[in-house]
Design a protein with these regions (language model features):
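Periplasmic c-type cytochrome electron-transfer domains
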Residues: 3, 8-9, 13, 17, ...
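Charged, compositionally biased non-catalytic regions
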Residues: 20-22
Length: 423
């Protein structure tokens, strides 16, 4: 069995950061290996197997985190791709980019195939790609240097047709015989495509539906039409309902050559200042700057207010470390360690942040230090510290001694880790 991992499970301060596909042995249900995809692979959403059982296709985002976020042309920040895995060898062969040189195909989501075609939904550009399967595979297998294929924006020339859909935000889809059935997440419209003719008919499932400001904001957050050449949406760096892609990015708002780990948007509007360096005084400013300097798009104030409303509506997912919704016995011990080490002097209040700057840890870039992040839902925002140098929360304490100025036992570190991961 091949299982996608949504995000990279590693430290982020490396030259190669990518999510993996795990191979599971079904007899004992044990993991055989992890197959790491192309550099920058994240948000692994779709997976399918070819009819002959030879190849696995995985649809995902490609984050170009090794360069500053200074432009968007030709997929400078984010591109969309699907990776090819050899089933028998259990090896990654290469990644095929589905964008075009002057037009992105953002929000890649689901993937399906039959002998004749490969079908891919694009939630950010509201369309489906139909790729000539046999011609694509032949060209792929004969490609001279697959290590650089994930930068080739011309690979699918003449092999792919982009079919626009009714509605907004096509995500999951079903291939059923000669029909491809594609609902749109933000419009409640069902698209049915005849795969023999590529003709699309649509049905409104909820014609009386009315959008709230939060609904509109979520739609704008995921819509690549609010971006220069449709290369990305806010979802490109903040997948999984406004959370994080697990990678470091060199934004231009606090200098160049100083990449920092992507932050979750959860509680961003109630824990100012914003960004790891605190360079934005509040989240409202950060939202508008994000459209201007990351999407390269002039967002209207009306739309920006809706995005604010959406982000304010985000709520934490209960931690899987909880037991029946309560702290485990180990986490309760960790709470005592948290208090003993005076972690609450910085991580205080309902959001576990005093919203102040502190000089803590290594390589302090700014004289005033770093903005104190919330610890709520921190279990799902690895890696940790300003540049993602800690792959796990335990490493924050055991390796990097974050805020710990005296010797702490392994038992206490285990308990502290359990507690923080339970918040």
């Amino acid at each position: 069995m091949f299982v996608t991992n949504f995000l990279p499970a590693q430290r982020a301060d490396l030259d190669y950061v990518a999510a993996c596909v795990s191979v599971i042995e079904m007899d004992g249900f044990t993991k055989v290996k992890d197959i790491q995809l192309a550099n920058g692979s994240n948000a692994l959403r779709g997976i399918c197997i070819t009819p002959d059982g030879k190849y696995i296709y995985v649809s995902h985002n490609l984050g170009r985190f090794t360069v500053p976020t200074s432009q968007l042309q030709q997929g400078w920040m984010n591109t969309s791709a699907f990776s090819v895995i050899d089933v028998d060898k259990q090896e990654f062969l290469g990644a095929i980019v589905v964008d075009e040189p002057e037009r992105g195909a953002a929000g890649i989501w689901s993937i399906a195939c039959n002998d004749e075609s490969v079908f891919i939904s694009h939630s950010g550009t509201h369309e489906v790609s139909v790729i000539d399967h046999k011609a694509m595979l032949e060209k792929f297998l004969n490609y001279p240097n697959k290590a650089v294929l994930d930068y080739d924006l011309t690979f699918l020339y003449g092999l792919r047709e982009r079919i626009p859909l009714e509605g907004n935000g096509p995500r999951n889809m079903i291939l059923n015989g000669d029909k491809l059935i594609i609902p749109t997440y933000f419009a409640d419209i069902l698209n049915i495509m005849d795969i023999n003719t590529n003709e699309v008919t649509s049905v409104e499932l909820n014609p009386e539906r009315e959008e709230t400001a939060e609904n509109k904001g979520e739609r704008y957050f995921n819509d690549a039409s609010h971006c220069f050449q449709n290369w990305q949406s806010c979802n490109g760096c903040h997948p999984g309902d406004g959370r994080t892609d697990g990678m470091n990015w060199d934004l231009m708002n606090d200098g160049v050559g100083n990449s920092k780990n992507c932050k979750s948007m959860l509680f961003s509007h109630v824990t100012p200042p914003n960004m790891i360096s605190g360079i934005r005084e509040h989240a409202e400013r950060a939202v508008r700057a994000g459209f201007n300097f990351i999407q390269f798009f002039e967002v209207s104030e009306e739309d920006a207010v809706c995005v604010d409303a959406y982000l304010k509506s985000l709520r934490p997912v209960p931690s899987p470390y909880l037991v029946n919704g309560e702290l485990s016995d180990l986490a309760k011990e960790g709470q005592k360690v948290f208090e003993k080490l005076k972690c609450g002097e910085c991580h205080s209040g309902v959001y576990y942040t005093d919203m102040k700057y502190h000089r803590i840890g290594e390589d302090i870039e700014f004289e005033k230090g770093w903005d104190t992040p919330t610890l709520r839902e921190v279990w799902r925002t690895a890696p940790y510290l300003f540049d993602g140098r800690a792959a796990t929360m335990k490493e924050v304490f055991s390796v990097h001694k974050h805020g710990i100025e005296k010797k702490v036992s392994e038992k206490d570190i285990e308990a502290l880790t359990e507690y923080v991961n339970s918040l």
